[in-house]
Amino acid sequence: YGIRLKVCVVDERSEIAASFHGVPQNDMGPRTDVMDGCGKAEGMQLLIRSMSPQIIAVDELGAESDFYAVEQALNCGSRVLGTIHAGNMKELSEKPYLKRWMERRLFQRFIFLEKETNGRRKMQVYDEHMERITC
């Protein structure tokens, strides 16, 4: 299985793991724990205290408490894979809680997905300096 990392997923609305009666229906990998039906901020804090994850995955960050929990996770040595609704770097940098993170370069990559008229998805990747990386 290659690199073995402890991964935890906070799946507030069962949109990532699609858990049913506590069992993930999507393949989350052999070393992944899923916290289902728990708020993002609370879930991240519980996982940091009890599971010592190397990576925490969470979707749709938006509330101030989410950003505080991400900052705690980063300060505790976990990496965070998170999603945020934004169409481009300008829109992303205008989000209230992200501005200071972007200034501190807490993120290594920013990936923007765009659906084209033919149904295909176009991807744009930026580095921590907010410079576009060609894929």
Regions found by a protein language model. Name each.
Residues 1-47:
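P-loop NTPase switch/communication element
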Residues 9, 33-36, 82, 112, ...:
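Structural signal for conserved beta-strand scaffold positions within catalytic alpha/beta enzyme cores
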Residues 26-29, 100-102, 129-133:
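Short, low-complexity, polar/charged sequence segments that are solvent-exposed and flexible
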Residues 108-135:
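Conserved P-loop NTPase
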Residues 51-111, 115:
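Conserved P-loop NTPase nucleotide-binding/switch module
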Residues 16-19, 90-92, 119-122:
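Switch/connector loops and helix/strand junctions flanking conserved nucleotide-binding motifs
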